[in-house]
UniProtKB/Swiss-Prot annotation:
The lineage of its organism: Bacteria, Bacillati, Mycoplasmatota, Mycoplasmoidales, Mycoplasmoidaceae. It comes from Mycoplasma pneumoniae (strain ATCC 29342 / M129 / Subtype 1). This is Uncharacterized protein MG237 homolog.
Length: 294
């Protein structure tokens, strides 16, 4: 349901939209040059090769700057723009991978420093600790991160995602943390690594049964089921580590009703308390009030 926060969604493959490799791109440019070998095209082919040389040296940052300079040149012929744009995409991809590899190789304490810089805007960098073994992530480092889980000003989804990341770090498994749920206005003591999603036993059973009922209700509507699952995710986050104080069958039926109305572009009845709860729970994850579409 809730996707594990264990990937950096950089969409790296999407950056390689036009050409799969530098070689393929260079061959395409060379083929164009054979049929359009004017002086300006020859000049830019040389500039292209200079960037390629930087790529061979793995100096992707400089290569990125050079690509951007060539694209900004007022005399760059329009037919050549796509070659440099595609080259920039490939360079951006490799620069991002290079930066990620450099960050992942940092000591755990340094990664935690980066996580806490410009708080809370870099919390997602906690994921660089996930591949590290217990030998590299000592339990005492957790003390520096505990406050994030009890920060009442932090958006619930961010706090939940941060907890889920901590829950997967081998060096922190077995350690106890305090977790504050701002919706419930309660603190909970949770053990890291004990469960994939550290819910109370009755909450785990509640959501498993809710998922099953939703699957049955949307058996012939798989696309609508995806939206219904997003609603379940929102409830899981908002009430974590508990479950909503609503009879399971009633909530499943109302989720089905709400999704069906939205898909058909029908007005929803906000006077219905359960429908209202669904809407508010969804908006809680967006950190804006119901009706604020800006």
């Amino acid at each position: 349901m809730i996707n594990k926060p264990n990937q950096f969604v950089n969409h790296l493959s999407a950056l390689k939209k036009h050409f799969a490799s530098y070689k393929e791109l260079r061959e395409a440019f060379n083929d164009y040059h054979k049929h359009n070998g004017d002086e300006l095209t020859t000049f830019f082919l040389h500039q292209f090769d200079k960037v390629m040389e930087l790529v061979k040296q793995k100096d992707f940052k400089t290569a990125q700057s050079r690509c951007e300079e060539e694209l900004a040149a007022p005399y760059l012929p329009k037919p050549l723009v796509s070659f440099f744009q595609s080259l920039l995409q490939l360079v951006n991809h490799d620069l991002l991978e290079q930066q990620n590899a450099a960050l992942a190789s940092l000591p755990a304490a340094k990664i935690i420093e980066l996580v806490l810089q410009d708080y809370p805007n870099k919390l997602n960098m906690i994921h660089y600790l996930l591949p590290k073994t217990k030998a590299f992530v000592k339990p005492h480092l957790l003390q520096r991160l505990q406050f994030v889980l009890t920060d009442s000003e932090l958006l619930e989804l961010k706090r939940f995602s941060f907890f889920q990341a901590l829950n997967q770090i081998p060096g922190f498994q077995g350690e106890q943390v305090e977790y504050f749920n701002s919706k419930l206005k309660q603190k909970f003591t949770l053990t890291l690594g004990e469960f994939e999603i550290a819910q109370q036993p009755d909450a785990k059973a509640y959501f498993e049964q809710l998922i099953t009922q939703i699957q049955q209700l949307f058996l012939k509507e798989p696309v609508n089921a995806e939206f219904a699952n997003e609603i379940i995710d929102a409830f899981l986050v908002s009430y974590f580590p508990l479950h909503p104080p609503v009879p399971l069958a009633q909530l499943a039926a109302k989720i089905y009703e709400y999704v069906s109305q939205i898909v058909l572009n029908e007005a929803v009845n906000l006077k219905d308390e359960l429908i209202k709860l669904i809407v508010h729970t969804l908006y809680e994850q967006l950190d804006r009030p119901v009706g604020d579409e800006n």
